[in-house]
Design a protein with these regions (language model features):
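N-terminal secretory signal peptides that target proteins for export/translocation
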Residues: 1-11
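Bacterial N-terminal signal peptides
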Residues: 14-27
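A compositional/structural signature for long, glycine/proline-rich flexible linkers
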Residues: 33-448
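Sec/Tat signal peptide C-region and signal peptidase I cleavage site
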Residues: 28-32
Length: 448
C-alpha cells in the first residue's frame, strides 16, 4: 500500500493577500494517515524493534556502576550460575564512542597458541569487523583506531584505521581458556581501550520497556523519531522501511481509535507471527539442530537481524563461529533429562577436524538455561576434554541422568531426571563443510 508523507509543504504566493490565502488553506482537507495493512505493520514493527533491542542493551550496560564509554569491562569467568554460560572463553566488553574529531584506540596484546577475537558491531547488531589472527594476519596485535564515518582525524603512526558505521559501536572480546584460565585472564586484562580526546556522546534514546516475555505494543512508534535518528542503518531497505515506520507513527498518533487498531493487530497477528518466525524459521533446522549460520551480517533481511537481537544479541558472523542448538532428539521429540541419549561422531567426521580453532558442547536445563549440577561438576565437553574414542576411531558422547552402557564414563554428560534440557554446540573457526551446511553434529539419538 502507499503511505502518505509526513508533512505537506505549502509555498506562500506573493500575489495573494494573506486573507485570501487563509481562506484557500481553510478549504484544503487535512491529510489523514492511512491505516496500514498487516504486512506493512509487521515490516515496520519488526524493523523498529530490532533497533529498540540494541538500545535496551545499551541502557542495561550503561546502568552498571562502573560503566564508562571507551573503557573495557573485564567480565569474570563464566560460572555455573550464569544463564547459558560459555565456559570456554574469558570475555571483555565495552561501548566505543567517537566523533568527527575524536577517534578511540584499542590495544590488542600478542596472543599465540590460543583463539581470540575482538568483535565490533554497530548499533543495529551488524558486525563491522573481527580483529584476530584470521582477519589481520599481517598485524594480529597492536593498535587499532576507530573513527567516525567520513572522519579525517589523525591517528597514531602504525595504527590500523577502522571506520565505524556510526558514532558508537559495541566491542565484545573473547580469549580461549584452553585449559589455562589464569593465562587467559592475564591476556584478557592486557586489552586496553581509550579515547584520544573528549568526544561528544549522545545518550541512548528513551524507549518504552521491552520485555521478551511480552513484546512492546504501539508505544514503540511514539519513539520512532529518536530511535531512528540515533544510529545509521546500513540495511539497503532502511530508507524505504523507515518511511513506513514514520507513516505508522503518524497513524498511531492520530487518535485513540487508530492506536487501538494497531495494538489489536500487534497482539493478535504481528507479534505472534514474528515470535513464531524467530523461534522456528529464522535459522535453518539441519539434522535436528537449529543452526545459527547466517548471522552477523544480514543484508536486507532485517527480520533475521531482529530475531538475532531478541534471542541472543550481538551475534557474530559464521566465518568466526557457528552455533548449533539442540532441543529435540533424532525422532524430533523434546530432549528429556530422564532419558538416555548418544551422539556418535563417525571417525571421518570428528568435530575437531571441522574447525580451525576449537569446538565445545554444553548442556543446560530448560527453562532456566543454567547448567545442571552433578557430582562430577561436568557441564560441557570441548576440544581439550579427555574423551575416549571407540576402537574404530569414532567418538560417542553419552547424555542422561546416569552413565550409558557401552560408552566410557569419561564421555558422559549428566542430565537432570525429570527436567527437559538443551544442548549448544559451538564451532569456533568453522571450516568449509560447516559453513556450507555439509556437516552438523550427529543427531541426539535415544538409547532404547
Amino acid at each position: 500500500m502507499t503511505l502518505v508523507t509526513r508533512s505537506l509543504l505549502v509555498r506562500p504566493i506573493a500575489a495573494i493577500s494573506a486573507a485570501v490565502l487563509a481562506i484557500l488553506l481553510a478549504s484544503v482537507p487535512a491529510f489523514a494517515a492511512d491505516a496500514p495493512d498487516e504486512e506493512t505493520l509487521s515490516d515496520a514493527y519488526v524493523y523498529l524493534l530490532g533497533r529498540g533491542l540494541a538500545i535496551r542493551q545499551e541502557h542495561i550496560d550503561a546502568a552498571a556502576a562502573d560503566f564508562e564509554y571507551n573503557v573495557i569491562h573485564y567480565n569474570p569467568l563464566g560460572t555455573a550460575d550464569f544463564v547459558n554460560p560459555n565456559l570456554d572463553v574469558a570475555y571483555l566488553e565495552a561501548w566505543i564512542a567517537v566523533d568527527d574529531d575524536t577517534p578511540a584506540l584499542l590495544e590488542v596484546p600478542k596472543i599465540e597458541g590460543r583463539y581470540y577475537t575482538v568483535q565490533i558491531l554497530d548499533e543495529w547488531g551488524e558486525v563491522i569487523v573481527n580483529i584476530n589472527q584470521r582477519t589481520f594476519p599481517s598485524m594480529p596485535y597492536g593498535t587499532f583506531a576507530f573513527v567516525a564515518p567520513g572522519s579525517t582525524a589523525p591517528i597514531p603512526e602504525g595504527a590500523v584505521r577502522i571506520t565505524l558505521h556510526g558514532r558508537k559501536a559495541k566491542l565484545l572480546g573473547r580469549v580461549e581458556l584452553k585449559g589455562d584460565p589464569e593465562g587467559a585472564v592475564a591476556l584478557q586484562k592486557q586489552f586496553m581501550l581509550r579515547s584520544m580526546g573528549t568526544p561528544r556522546i549522545a545518550p541512548p534514546p528513551t524507549i518504552p520497556e521491552i520485555d521478551n516475555e511480552k513484546l512492546v505494543d504501539s508505544t514503540i512508534f511514539d519513539h520512532a523519531g529518536p530511535i531512528l535518528a540515533s544510529a545509521l542503518d546500513i540495511n539497503p531497505l532502511a530508507a524505504q522501511t523507515q518511511q513506513q515506520v514514520y507513516a505508522i507513527a503518524d497513524y498511531v498518533a492520530s487518535g485513540d481509535e487508530a492506536r487501538a487498531s494497531i495494538d489489536g493487530m500487534l497482539k493478535d497477528k504481528v507479534i505472534p507471527g514474528f515470535l513464531d518466525y524467530a523461534l522456528t524459521k529464522s535459522v535453518p533446522y539441519l539434522n535436528h539442530w537449529m543452526v545459527a549460520d547466517r548471522s552477523g551480517n544480514y543484508g536486507a533481511d532485517y527480520r533475521a537481524r531482529t530475531s538475532a537481537n531478541l534471542l541472543g544479541i550481538w551475534a557474530n558472523v559464521p566465518s568466526e563461529v557457528i552455533y548449533f542448538v539442540g532441543l529435540r532428539d533424532s525422532n524430533d521429540k523434546e530432549l528429556d533429562g530422564s532419558a538416555s541419549y548418544v551422539m556418535h561422531f563417525p571417525a571421518d567426521a570428528l568435530p575437531q577436524a571441522q574447525v580451525n580453532s576449537y569446538w565445545s558442547v554444553i548442556l543446560v536445563g530448560v527453562p532456566d538455561y543454567k547448567v545442571v549440577s552433578n557430582s562430577l561438576n561436568r557441564y560441557n565437553f570441548n576440544t581439550y576434554s579427555d574423551l575416549v574414542p571407540e576402537p574404530d576411531g569414532s567418538m560417542k558422547i553419552a547424555i542422561g541422568p546416569k552413565p550409558v552402557e557401552g560408552v566410557p564414563e569419561s564421555n558422559w554428560l549428566p542430565s537432570r531426571a525429570g527436567s527437559p534440557f538443551s544442548l549448544t554446540f559451538r564451532a569456533y573457526g568453522p571450516k568449509a563443510p560447516i559453513i556450507q551446511e555439509k556437516w552438523q553434529p550427529p543427531a541426539v539419538t535415544p538409547v532404547e
